[in-house]
Regions:
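Bacterial Sec-dependent N-terminal signal peptides
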Residues: 1-21
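Accessory carbohydrate-recognition regions in carbohydrate-active enzymes
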Residues: 20-250
């Protein structure tokens, strides 16, 4: 009987140490519920939205390819970027979307080349905070939403070639790097219909670290001699040397 009681106490103690800390009703919410969906079988058709109630913009880790209504699926093992989204459902798809992705090593823009393996064991998802370890780049990404934007924090390894990719997606987009202000501005027109002819979603990214590398990207072509691109599919790459554990805020 004493052994049984000791076992029960040990089990409860272990559970207490690993149980999630609840500070409010929002902590009962798991944004990952309903994300194991695909076109052939809907099991929720949700995505892990990081957002404030009635926020203007939502953010989501993007496992699907550009234009895929199933932007995040639980059984995927690669993240291509962290997307600003306004998507009501995968069937209706998205509008006004663009993505941000930290990478290390080679300066690449292609969504498959920049993608990184990740594990749900190294992923934290709540409505008000998201964190994941990008194994291929050895970078930790954290996101906290605001009413109209979000705060990003990237924790880089020691690397002479650390970058952030900004992908304004296709359908007509514009991106400009402003090194003197540690800033990237631009717009995306990506949509799935039902928007005005002059629709644009403008964005501004401000970094707390100066750029030592800059490049504009037009239709997949990376040009280090240009600071802006205005084309069917525009984007940008900025880079810097980082120390082990150095955090870059956006």
């Amino acid at each position: 009987m004493k052994k049984l009681a000791l076992f029960a106490f040990t089990l409860l103690s272990a559970w207490a140490m690993t149980a999630k800390t609840i500070t409010g009703p929002v902590d009962y919410v798991s944004p990952l519920v309903g994300t194991q969906s695909k076109h052939a079988l809907s099991t929720g058709n949700t995505y892990p939205a990081i957002a404030l109630p009635w926020g203007m913009n939502f953010w989501v880790p993007q496992t699907g390819k550009m234009g895929d209504g199933w932007a995040y699926t639980y059984d995927a093992d690669k993240i291509r970027g962290f997307k600003q989204t306004h998507q009501p459902s995968p069937w209706i798809n998205d509008y006004g979307q663009f993505s941000i992705m930290p990478i290390t090593g080679k300066a690449v823009f292609d969504q498959d080349q920049r993608a990184s393996w990740f594990s749900h064991k190294a992923e934290t998802a709540t409505p008000y905070y998201y964190k994941v370890y990008l194994a291929d780049h050895d970078v930790v990404t954290e996101i906290a939403p605001t009413e109209r934007a979000a705060a990003f924090r990237f924790t880089f390894p020691e690397n002479d070639h650390s970058y952030v990719v900004v992908d304004a997606f296709d359908n007509g987009s514009f991106v400009k790097v402003i090194p003197s202000e540690n800033k990237i501005i631009g717009y995306t027109t990506k949509n799935s219909g039902g928007v005005p002819a002059n629709f644009k979603n403008y964005f501004v990214l401000e970094f707390d670290k100066p750029f030592t590398y800059t490049a504009a990207v037009a239709n997949g072509n990376i040009d280090t001699n240009k600071l802006e691109a205005n084309d069917k599919h525009a984007g940008a790459l900025i880079g810097f040397k980082t120390r082990k554990g150095e955090q870059v805020n956006v």
